[in-house]
Structure formats: structure tokens, C-alpha cells
């Protein structure tokens, strides 16, 4: 049996971000020999479980929500401190602990979201309006990162499709485009490309309209019974549990119904690595690592990290497979 090749930082980190990190370290005069751990997804995971200076999320406000039985999956939850302390949110830094450390000052009071485009009723709503208009419910979802780690999270929100129906899309609407807040003063990664991984900001994402209308697609305002902390995408983020986590755009300010497929940030950055669809698929590897298995982040320490098989559509094939009937999932990854 041949030995499995060891993963390097370049193997598990997007190439553009990998080289940005190297530039940052060089600018700071930090050499490889002086680093205790390489800054990549695997090392971030190791340092997290060591418990060194783990950042604490700011306290959230309690939310009122229902718990529909159909959405309370009997799965082992990832502990709250790991859900809120191990994140990708490059607007606040490249390492997993950076968002919790740097996002605490994000101003979310009076936050507004604009819904427009190919709709009969364009409207701007603040976050309180959304919560009052669309009753909240808790849904326990699997979450799978493209970096081959996973969590199980009790999100609180409402179906994206309900908001879309409220805006009354017209016959030209075929896709839904999303945009994150653009505020370099609050989000240092937008101001400094070394901090933000060299991505083009604001962060943008998109779905086909039928994907957006699927009941699984959730506009999320809370987690673990409280409002979202900034590092998790406060005050409003998208959750599409059958897709890789980078599709879950955070801190949304604009939702637009459009005719043509919208650009998406990671697809623009590295189209050979990150497709528009980004459906979880154990049979379609990332060009630099396998997607056949994943590391589940649970309640244990580093020795207890569970490696498990990746499920097609992250275990939600029954609900979403029909959306892609006749579509080559290798070509349309």
C-alpha cells in the first residue's frame, strides 16, 4: 500500500490566500522556522483544540423561535464555543480565530437589507422588520466546509423562499444574487488585501432561483438560541446545507433577483477550484485535496476528532437531488 502524501499548507488553502499569507509573514519578518504552526486549515484546527487564547463571542440577544420536529435532526451538535470561534470570514482575517477576535465591533443595529431586481415589490427592510414579518424556527443542519471539515449547528432563521415570494419575482427572475456589507472601516480585510486574502470585495454569492426556493435554504439570524455573533455573519447570513460553506454568505445587505447567473467571489478568485454550484460531493475532489472524507468538529479534543465519509449533498440528497437531474455534477461543480 502506498503511503498517503502529506498535505502541505498549499494543499488545503486556496492558492491566492496561501501566497497572501506568505507575503504577510515576510512583511512582518517572520520566518518559517519561527512559526510554531503553519497557518492553514489543518494547523488552525490543531491550535484550536489546544485551547490557547480561544476568543469568546460577544453575548447575543435571546430569540423567540419554534422547533419544528422535522428539522430537529438527532445529530451530535458542535459545541457553541467552536461554532463561534472557528470561522472563515476573510473580511476580518485569514485564520480561523481572527473573525471572533476582530469582528466584535461590527455595528448591526439598524441593519437594512434591500430586495430588488426582477421583482414586483422591491423593498428595504431592517433586521427587526424581517424578524417580525417572518416567524423564526430552529433547524439543526450539517455544515460542510470545502476545506474538508464539518460541524452540526442549530441555526435560527426563516426560509429564504418566503422572502422571495414576498417580493414577487417576475418571469425574468432566474437567479438570486447576494452581497455582503462593504465597509472597509469596519471590515479590515476589505481595506488591506494582506488581511483579506486578496479577494475582490464586497463578497458576493448566488443561487439559481429554484435552489433559493428550496425549503432547506435558510436566511439565518441566530444560533444556539441567540442572535448571531459578528464572526458568524451577523445579523443575517445564508445557510444552504447541501452546499459547501463558502456559499453561506454573511452579513447580507442586498438580495437581487436577476436574469443571468451572477458572479460569485470564490469562483471569480479561482474558477478551477470553486464552482458556482459548490454542492457537497464526495466524488468530485478539490484539485488539491480529496473530498471523500471530512473531519467532524465535535465536543472532544484533538485526539477525538472524527473522520467520517462525506455524504452526497451533505446528506440532503432526498430534498435537493431533483434540482440537478440531468446535470453533470463533475462539470458543474
From Swiss-Prot:
Family, according to the entry, reads as follows: Belongs to the MsrP family.
**Reactions listed under catalytic activity:** L-methionyl-[protein] + a quinone + H2O = L-methionyl-(S)-S-oxide-[protein] + a quinol; L-methionyl-[protein] + a quinone + H2O = L-methionyl-(R)-S-oxide-[protein] + a quinol
> Gene encoding this chain?
msrP
Q: Which residues are listed for Mo-molybdopterin binding in this entry?
A: 87, 90-91, 145, 180, 232, 237, 248-250
Name the coenzymes or cofactors required: Mo-molybdopterin
What protein name does the entry list? Answer: Protein-methionine-sulfoxide reductase catalytic subunit MsrP
* HAMAP family referenced in this protein's UniProt entry, alphabetically: MsrP
Q: Where does the record place it?
A: Periplasm
Q: Which GO terms describe its biological process?
A: protein repair
Signal sequence coordinates: 1-43
The cofactor remark states: Binds 1 Mo-molybdopterin (Mo-MPT) cofactor per subunit.
List the EC numbers from the record: 1.8.5.-
Assembly state and interactors?
Answer: Heterodimer of a catalytic subunit (MsrP) and a heme-binding subunit (MsrQ).
Q: Name one GO molecular function term.
A: metal ion binding
Question: Which InterPro entries does the entry mention?
Answer: MsrP (IPR022867), OxRdtase_Mopterin-bd_dom (IPR000572), OxRdtase_Mopterin-bd_sf (IPR036374), TAT_signal (IPR006311)
Amino acid at each position: 500500500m502506498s503511503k498517503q502524501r502529506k498535505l502541505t499548507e498549499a494543499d488545503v488553502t486556496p492558492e491566492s490566500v496561501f501566497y497572501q499569507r506568505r507575503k504577510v509573514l515576510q512583511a512582518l519578518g517572520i520566518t518559517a522556522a519561527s512559526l510554531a504552526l503553519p497557518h492553514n486549515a489543518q494547523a488552525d484546527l490543531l491550535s484550536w483544540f489546544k485551547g490557547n487564547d480561544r476568543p469568546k463571542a460577544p453575548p447575543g440577544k435571546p430569540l423567540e423561535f419554534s422547533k419544528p420536529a422535522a428539522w430537529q435532526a438527532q445529530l451530535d451538535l458542535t459545541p457553541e464555543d467552536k461554532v463561534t470561534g472557528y470561522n472563515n470570514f476573510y473580511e476580518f482575517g485569514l485564520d480561523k480565530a481572527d473573525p471572533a477576535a476582530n469582528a466584535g465591533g461590527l455595528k448591526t443595529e439598524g441593519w437594512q437589507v434591500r430586495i430588488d431586481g426582477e421583482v414586483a415589490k422591491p423593498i428595504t427592510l431592517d433586521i427587526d422588520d424581517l424578524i417580525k414579518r417572518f416567524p423564526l424556527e430552529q433547524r439543526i443542519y450539517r455544515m460542510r466546509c470545502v476545506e474538508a471539515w464539518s460541524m452540526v449547528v442549530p441555526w435560527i432563521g426563516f426560509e429564504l423562499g418566503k422572502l422571495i415570494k414576498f417580493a414577487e419575482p417576475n418571469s425574468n427572475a432566474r437567479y438570486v444574487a447576494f452581497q455582503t456589507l462593504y465597509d472597509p472601516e469596519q471590515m479590515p480585510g476589505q481595506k488591506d488585501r494582506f488581511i483579506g486574502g486578496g479577494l475582490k470585495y464586497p463578497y458576493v454569492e448566488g443561487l439559481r432561483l429554484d435552489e433559493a426556493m428550496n425549503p432547506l435554504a435558510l436566511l439565518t439570524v441566530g444560533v444556539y438560541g441567540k442572535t448571531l455573533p459578528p464572526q458568524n455573519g451577523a445579523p443575517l447570513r445564508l445557510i444552504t446545507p447541501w452546499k459547501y460553506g463558502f456559499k453561506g454568505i454573511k452579513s447580507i445587505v442586498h438580495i437581487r433577483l436577476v436574469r443571468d447567473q451572477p458572479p460569485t467571489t470564490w469562483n471569480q478568485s479561482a474558477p478551477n477550484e470553486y464552482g458556482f454550484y459548490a454542492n457537497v460531493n464526495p466524488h468530485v475532489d478539490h484539485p488539491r485535496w480529496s473530498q471523500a472524507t471530512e473531519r467532524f468538529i465535535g465536543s472532544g479534543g484533538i485526539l477525538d476528532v472524527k473522520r467520517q465519509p462525506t455524504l452526497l449533498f451533505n446528506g440532503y440528497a432526498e430534498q435537493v437531488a431533483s434540482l440537478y437531474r440531468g446535470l453533470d455534477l463533475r462539470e458543474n461543480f
